[in-house]
Design a protein with these regions (language model features):
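FAD/FMN-dependent oxidoreductases across multiple families
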Residues: 159-162, 177, 274-353, 358-360
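Glycine-rich FAD pyrophosphate-binding loop
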Residues: 61-80
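N-terminal Rossmann-fold NAD(P) dinucleotide-binding loop
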Residues: 53
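A conserved beta-strand/loop capping segment in the N-terminal third of enzymes
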Residues: 89-145
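Beta1/beta-strand and adjacent pyrophosphate-binding region of the FAD-binding site
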Residues: 40-50
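Predominantly flavin-linked oxidoreductase catalytic cores and closely associated redox partners
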Residues: 149-292
Length: 429
């Protein structure tokens, strides 16, 4: 088996390959699948090394395909995310007890057995569970773990700078070719433009996304994650097993405060991102005034955006292309969770590729689009607000519902945040 690894000790553009148990060597631009005129041929190319891309690559490699994964970052790398995974994610990834034990020995893996939920500036409710319903992770560690586990050819530190069609193959960056391309580069995935006719540059993609925000459910978030020293640890009131969720007074978003061992993650996400910095500033001031966090934390907020499943205008397939995760706009509609949809869409994409038997035209990939809609919801055709209650009435009803323990446990947490009503992804589906 040929294995590529990517880490901080690997220079961008280099691939570390391993054959057998202990033979290591550095190569530049070498592929065991095919090498002609400086072009490396693979069975599939994945653009993006997050959970969606690495999961898809892992599944394809296990089925015997020769896969190349490229990412502009060198792993491990920081990633803006609240960072928790539910048991169905562990099941979908087929992580066995030994792998989990090895993971938690050297990485953050914080069991969650409770939540505190409230509307900002109002009294909260604590909901407890007898066993862990989720686990806090650091994307810095988790993504690097999944990428290493994929055991595919890696090109880290290499952004996708060009993409062109040659017959039935895609040629990436002029040197990497494959008949099937998986776009897993997140909300601003460069592959998405070839499916959805978007501008090529990152700045143009962001401008297009800003326009998108006025028509579709684009969520923007600001958040920070950092390690606490002993003094700061004693000043934070959040318990590691019980993240705190704070819903905005207009119910257009929510903030969170989540401690994972010695790490603290704080953030705020909203469906109306136009005044997000102001809302985030007010939220942090509220946390300090409430005594949840001290005022001297090193708070550098970082932003990201994503589309909610069932509202995304993006097409998820093209000729020889599949989009997965946030590139396809699959975040959970109420919580904004992206890791479970990323992992599951990565598995569904791998399954569609394997079932296509080398035929990757749109018709052959159509089952993947249908499966995404079945799993995560099809975009609504009618976006008219006719027949919906006025916002003031909806807000008043929401205030009252948030006071009910039954509603908080079974709707807000079990359904919206933990997805417990959704069955695990069936292997044969």
């Amino acid at each position: 088996m040929t294995v590529g690894q990517c880490g901080a000790n690997v220079k961008p553009g280099r691939v570390l390959l391993r054959e057998g148990a202990a033979q290591y060597a550095f190569f530049i631009g070498i592929s065991f699948a095919g090498h002609e005129n400086g072009v490396n041929s693979y069975d599939a190319v994945v653009v993006g090394g997050g959970p969606a891309g690495s999961t898809c690559a892992w599944k394809l490699r296990r089925a015997g395909l020769n896969v190349c994964l490229i990412d502009r970052a060198v792993f491990p790398r920081d990633k803006v995310c609240a960072g928790w995974i539910t048991p169905p994610v562990i099941e979908a990834l087929e992580l066995d007890p030994q792998e989990l034990d090895e993971y938690r020995q050297s990485r953050v893996f914080q069991p969650i057995t409770a939540f505190r939920t409230s509307v900002i500036s109002r009294a909260g409710i604590e909901t407890r569970y007898p066993t862990p319903v989720s686990f806090g992770i650091r994307r810095y560690e988790f993504d690097a773990f999944l990428l290493k586990r994929a055991r595919v050819h890696l090109r880290c530190g290499q952004p996708m700078t060009s993409l062109r069609r040659s017959g039935k193959d895609w040629i990436v960056n002029g040197t990497i070719t494959a008949p099937i391309l998986v776009g897993a580069g997140g909300h601003f995935c460069p592959v998405a433009r070839h499916v959805n006719d978007r501008p090529a540059s990152a700045s143009a993609l962001r401008a297009a996304a800003d326009k998108e925000a006025g028509r579709h459910q684009v969520v923007a978030a600001l958040e920070a994650e950092f390690e606490l020293n002993d003094r700061q640890l004693s000043q934070v009131s959040v318990h590691p097993e019980a993240p705190e969720l704070f819903f905005c007074e207009d119910f257009a978003g929510y903030g969170w405060c989540f401690r994972k061992g010695r790490y603290l993650n704080i953030g705020l996400g909203r469906q109306d991102p136009r005044e997000l910095p102001r809302h985030a500033k007010s939220f942090l001031e509220f946390l300090v005034a409430r005594g949840v966090i001290p005022s001297n934390l090193p708070m550098r907020l970082h932003g990201h955006a994503y589309l909610l499943a069932g509202t995304s205008p993006r097409e998820s397939i093209g000729e020889g292309i599949l989009l997965v995760g946030d590139a396809a706009g699959l975040a959970e509609p109420h919580s904004g969770e992206g890791i479970r949809p990323a992992v599951e869409s990565g598995l569904l994409a791998a399954r569609a590729i394997l079932n296509a038997n080398g035929r990757y035209d749109r018709d052959a990939l159509e089952p993947y689009r249908r499966r995404l809609h079945e799993r995560f919801g099809a975009p609504a055709r009618n976006t008219s607000s006719a027949g919906t209650p006025p916002s003031w009435l909806a807000t008043r009803v929401a205030y009252q519902a948030m006071k009910l323990r039954w509603f908080t446990r079974h709707i807000v947490l079990d359904r919206w945040f933990l997805g417990r009503q959704r069955p695990p992804l069936a292997e044969t589906a």
